[in-house]
């Protein structure tokens, strides 16, 4: 293939990938975090290729083959083949074995956060040679990168489970490397190809820690990745087993939402208070209670003493008879436990969004290894900004409104949600 036709092909691929990346971002309600970053990287690649085409930049033909496009294409294809993609090119912070702070880029975070994917576009030969110590200075082998992924994933539990790691190879992987990754607990996706060995004992091919760099060329002479000899083709796992957390911690905002008259049909009013009218409108568009019930189903419910005490106090002041009655039934379903905030929750610095009450409630959920249900997204974001990521289920808020209905204006019987637009 001539340099010009290769360039035209690369430009066509870049344009197609931009469309696919934009489509991916639209496929999830609220978009995919990092989707814009992926699109901008692809657009930068296209711009560069168009400059080459226009003769503004001169590059070698070999450089055309090794553009970032291969890796970006692998990311797009991975994201297209996975369920519940929440982010792409996500940067996670972690502490390495020496106690140094490091960052790790995860190409695709899928399965609601439970799966981390590294998409690899490099050829099996190059990857295998780097592993044998024959790469360029500073090249990190896939196995070393896998160790980083494991280290980081153990420090970033999702609902108290470590994310499952998949290394997705789009230009094959050698059989010994695939085996090593599997031993480490990492899933492999892609074509697994043979390594032709000229030794009687293939295990001698794997360099030990005591082997010096001088022995590298000898190793290279006795191993050859045979990409024609595909031993297995492994697709992405269709069902990744996730240990579903069966414990739920209820925040005050959730307790209120669960018993609110708004959640039980009392949303056809225009209230004196603007915020209540807005919540009623939200409820008419999207009911919250079915979402709460679905998440709470078959789970053990907890609430800390502070949350229940404050909830009762709010209920005594603002609650209507129906709301109080529902609260009595709800509290009977809940295990009320003493306040026991976790150590990492107590390390949070107080701010306008982080008060002692929220800290106690979320911290107790953390100690219980429970998912905290909440409408308090401000606290969750503020804690996240301080490096503390709580396991949460966030929903829309609903206030206690039953006692406000007497002064509210009922909506006409024929009023529909469409009338609001």
UniProtKB/Swiss-Prot annotation:
Record InterPro entries: DUF1308 (IPR010733), DUF5614 (IPR041076)
Top-level lineage group: Eukaryota
Similarity comment: Belongs to the UPF0415 family.
Entry protein name: UPF0415 protein C7orf25
Organism of this sequence: Homo sapiens
């Amino acid at each position: 293939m001539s340099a010009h036709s290769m360039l035209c092909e690369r430009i066509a691929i870049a344009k197609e990938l931009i469309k696919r990346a934009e489509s991916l971002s639209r496929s999830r309600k609220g978009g995919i975090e990092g989707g814009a970053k992926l699109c901008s990287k692809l657009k930068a690649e296209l711009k560069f290729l168009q400059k080459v085409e226009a003769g503004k930049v001169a590059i070698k033909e070999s450089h055309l083959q090794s553009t970032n496009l291969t890796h970006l294409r692998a990311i797009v294809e991975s994201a297209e083949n996975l369920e519940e993609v929440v982010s792409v090119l996500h940067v996670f912070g972690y502490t390495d074995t020496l106690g140094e702070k490091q960052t790790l880029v995860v190409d695709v975070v899928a399965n609601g956060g439970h799966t981390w994917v590294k998409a690899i576009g490099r050829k099996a030969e190059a990857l295998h040679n780097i592993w044998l110590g024959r790469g360029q200075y500073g090249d990190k082998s896939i196995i070393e990168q896998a160790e980083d992924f494991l280290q980081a994933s153990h420090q970033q539990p999702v609902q108290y489970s470590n994310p499952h790691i998949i290394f997705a190879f789009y230009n094959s992987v050698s059989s010994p490397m695939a085996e090593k990754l599997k031993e480490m607990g990492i899933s492999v996706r892609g074509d697994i190809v043979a390594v032709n060995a000229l030794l009687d004992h293939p295990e001698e091919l794997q360099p030990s820690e005591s082997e010096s760099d001088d022995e590298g060329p000898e190793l290279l002479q006795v191993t050859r990745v045979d990409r024609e000899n595909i031993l297995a083709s492994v697709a992405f796992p269709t069902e990744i087993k996730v240990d579903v957390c069966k414990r739920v911690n209820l925040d005050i905002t959730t307790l209120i939402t669960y018993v609110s008259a708004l959640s039980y049909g009392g949303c056809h009013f225009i209230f004196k208070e603007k915020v209540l009218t807005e919540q009623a409108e939200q409820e008419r568009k999207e009911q919250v209670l079915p979402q709460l019930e679905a998440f709470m189903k078959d789970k053990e419910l907890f609430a800390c003493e502070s949350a229940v005490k404050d909830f009762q106090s709010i209920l005594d002041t603002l609650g209507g008879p129906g709301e109080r009655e529902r609260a009595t039934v709800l509290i009977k379903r809940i295990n009320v436990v003493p306040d026991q905030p976790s150590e990492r929750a107590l390390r949070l610095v107080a701010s306008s969004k982080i008060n002692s009450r929220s800290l106690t409630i979320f911290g107790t959920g953390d100690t219980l290894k429970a998912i905290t249900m909440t409408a308090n997204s401000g606290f969750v974001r503020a804690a996240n900004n301080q490096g503390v990521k709580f396991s949460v289920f966030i929903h829309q808020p609903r206030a206690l409104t039953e006692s406000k209905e007497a002064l509210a204006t009922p909506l006409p019987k024929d009023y529909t949600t469409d009338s609001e637009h």
